[in-house]
């Protein structure tokens, strides 16, 4: 078998994986719309109440789960290449921390409970603010990628400390709201909130198309520059795109951990490291994972709903450990 045939077979394998994951996402989405306290059968006509339940409650929730999962997974895959660290995720640069901090400050600063739109704008503003702080420090001090990672960790610790102070001084009602949001939830998703997905979608598509530059960055900054990549400009474009996606994700569903870390790493262990295929596959896999997690969050308890962040951690951690053990045994 010649080299050209090997490349062709590899491309077909990636394309087959994309088709399989797309089918899985469609099946999970169908199940997501059907199940709940009221079962909606696709084989019979729906009443007015069932149509309203489907269109106004379940469909917005499905879109939120899929968009958040895709955004976090692609952001994680990009950061892991950009920083050269498999432990990198959207929270590692302090971007998620900035979004959560802004929402907490809005919750306690305003005399009345903020509207969902105010929460969304606050989360996006917080993530962008922390990104601009990061960019300003890095440009002033001419930071390398490794030092950029350390600055992001420091910003994340700072935001976490302030949120902890908010916990300490909050009353019972505010504390419950804050706790539930920090654990991640899309139970209140509505079409009104999905104006933010109009911002997420083009950024997500653009990021999924950056596979070839990221493949060159994996060779190192010097080699990437020799291959025609403006590393400095590309780095900040990617960070700004990630900040928008993460801010919108936090605004829609709170802090949902583990997706950006586990999904790209699992796909690399299973299928390889070509980012031109890995990024769109991460988007589909991340969307499918969060849709599946939300199905479990709604069905596991009869009288209550589990936080989505708890579900993603419960699903992702055992799979991640199993894949690491399998990879080690195969060596």
UniProtKB/Swiss-Prot annotation:
Keywords (alphabetical) are:
Cell inner membrane, Cell membrane, Membrane, Transmembrane, Transmembrane helix, Transport
GO terms assigned for molecular function: vitamin transmembrane transporter activity
Q: Which SUPFAM superfamilies match?
A: ABC transporter involved in vitamin B12 uptake, BtuC
The GO cellular component terms are: plasma membrane
| Membrane association type | Multi-pass membrane protein
Output the Gene3D superfamilies linked to this UniProt entry: ABC transporter involved in vitamin B12 uptake, BtuC
Membrane-spanning residues: 20-42, 62-84, 91-113, 118-140, 147-169, 189-208, 240-262, 277-299, 306-325
Check the record and name the NCBIfam families matching this protein: PRK03784.1
**Subunit structure comment from the entry:** The complex is composed of two ATP-binding proteins (BtuD), two transmembrane proteins (BtuC) and a solute-binding protein (BtuF).
Q: What is this protein called?
A: Vitamin B12 import system permease protein BtuC
């Amino acid at each position: 078998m010649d080299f050209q045939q090997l490349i062709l077979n590899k491309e077909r394998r990636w394309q087959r994986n994309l088709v399989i994951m797309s089918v899985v996402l469609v099946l999970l989405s169908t199940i997501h719309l059907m199940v709940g306290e009221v079962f909606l059968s696709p084989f019979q006509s729906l009443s007015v109440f069932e149509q309203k339940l489907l269109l106004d409650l379940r469909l917005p929730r499905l879109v939120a789960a899929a968009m958040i999962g895709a955004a976090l997974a692609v952001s994680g895959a990009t950061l892991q290449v950009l920083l050269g660290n498999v432990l990198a995720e959207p929270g590692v640069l302090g971007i998620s921390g900035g979004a959560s901090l802004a929402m907490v400050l809005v919750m306690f600063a305003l005399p009345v409970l903020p509207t969902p739109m105010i929460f969304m704008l606050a989360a996006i503003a917080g993530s962008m603010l922390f990104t601009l702080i990061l960019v300003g420090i890095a440009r002033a001090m001419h930071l390398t990628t490794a030092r950029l990672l350390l600055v992001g960790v420091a910003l994340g610790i700072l935001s976490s400390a302030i949120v902890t102070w908010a916990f300490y001084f909050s009353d019972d009602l505010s504390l419950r709201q804050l706790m539930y949001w920090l654990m991640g939830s899309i139970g209140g998703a509505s079409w009104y909130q999905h104006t933010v997905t109009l911002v997420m979608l083009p950024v997500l598509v653009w990021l999924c198309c950056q596979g070839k530059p990221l493949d060159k960055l994996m060779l190192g900054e010097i080699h990437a520059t020799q291959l025609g990549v403006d590393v400095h400009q590309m780095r900040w474009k990617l960070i700004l795109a990630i900040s928008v996606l993460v801010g919108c994700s936090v605004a829609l569903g709170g802090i949902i951990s583990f997706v950006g870390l586990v999904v790209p790493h699992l796909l690399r262990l299973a299928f390889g490291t070509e980012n031109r295929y890995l990024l769109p596959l991460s988007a589909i896999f991340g969307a499918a994972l969060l849709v599946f997690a939300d199905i479990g969050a709604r069905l596991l308890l009869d009288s209550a709903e589990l936080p989505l962040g708890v579900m993603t951690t419960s699903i992702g951690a055992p799979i991640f450990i199993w894949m690491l053990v399998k990879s080690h045994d195969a060596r």
